[in-house]
């Protein structure tokens, strides 16, 4: 009986929650967004448009990096960027 109550409480606490992740957002072709001139404002706006909490230009790779992206938003994988192909 105690386990049943615990299970109900856990289900109620997790119902409706959406996971968040950090990473490099990508376009349809697995290409990350480039931030020329190290433009943090551009990356922050891009990330927030994708429902992330915030973002910045990661200067080592010159790519936008987002914090708190929804799980449904694709991020950079190990696959190659297929620029120009749909």
From Swiss-Prot:
Which cysteine pairs are covalently linked by disulfides here? 31-81, 35-57, 43-64, 47-66
Q: Which GO terms describe its cellular component?
A: extracellular region
Concerning Pfam families, the annotation shows: Toxin_3 (PF00537)
State the tissue distribution.
Expressed by the venom gland.
Q: Name one GO biological process term.
A: defense response
Question: Record's superkingdom?
Answer: Eukaryota
Q: Any idea which residues bear Serine amide here?
A: 83
Q: Where is the signal peptide?
A: 1-19
Q: What is its main location?
A: secreted
Query: Which CDD domains does this UniProt record tie to the protein?
Result: neurotoxins_LC_scorpion
Per the record, the similarity remark reads:
Belongs to the long (4 C-C) scorpion toxin superfamily. Sodium channel inhibitor family. Alpha subfamily.
Name listed for the protein in its UniProt record: Alpha-mammal toxin Ts3
UniProt source species: Tityus serrulatus (Brazilian scorpion)
């Amino acid at each position: 009986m105690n386990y049943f109550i615990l299970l109900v409480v856990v289900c109620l606490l997790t119902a409706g929650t959406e996971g968040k992740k950090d990473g490099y957002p990508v376009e349809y072709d697995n290409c990350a967004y480039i931030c020329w001139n190290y433009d943090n404002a551009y990356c922050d706006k891009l990330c927030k448009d994708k429902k992330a909490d915030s973002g910045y230009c990661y200067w080592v790779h010159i790519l936008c990096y987002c914090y708190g992206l929804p799980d449904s938003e694709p991020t950079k994988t190990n696959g190659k960027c297929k620029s120009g192909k749909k």
